[in-house]
């Protein structure tokens, strides 16, 4: 297995949100999060207009879930900030 270009890390809040998902959905969402380590700017990624350095990608069954993350190119790091349903994920973004 070849090493991935970027390292994935999660905020404590993002980990809690991921753990709260149904097991089936969590597996689907996590497998798509893992792909961000290979390409943090995949097709369909969008930069959030209101927050500097934050991106979002649609994931999971029906693409109804969002992963909000920061890309730190200088450290080759993807920091997952929020994970959740598209209706809830943008609340309380700091």
Feature annotation, model-predicted:
Residues 1-7, 12, 16, 20, ...:
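Enriched for short, Lys/Arg-rich terminal
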Residues 18, 22, 33, 52:
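Short amphipathic alpha-helical/adjacent loop interface patches that line ligand
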């Amino acid at each position: 297995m070849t090493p991935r270009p970027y390292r994935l890390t999660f905020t404590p809040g993002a980990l809690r949100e991921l753990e709260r998902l149904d097991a089936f959905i969590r597996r689907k969402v996590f497998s798509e999060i893992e792909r961000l380590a290979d390409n943090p700017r995949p097709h369909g990624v969008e930069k959030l207009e209101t927050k500097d350095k934050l991106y979002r990608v649609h994931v999971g069954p029906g693409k109804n879930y969002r992963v909000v993350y920061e890309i730190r190119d200088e450290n080759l790091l993807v920091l997952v900030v929020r994970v959740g349903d598209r209706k809830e994920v943008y609340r309380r973004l700091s």
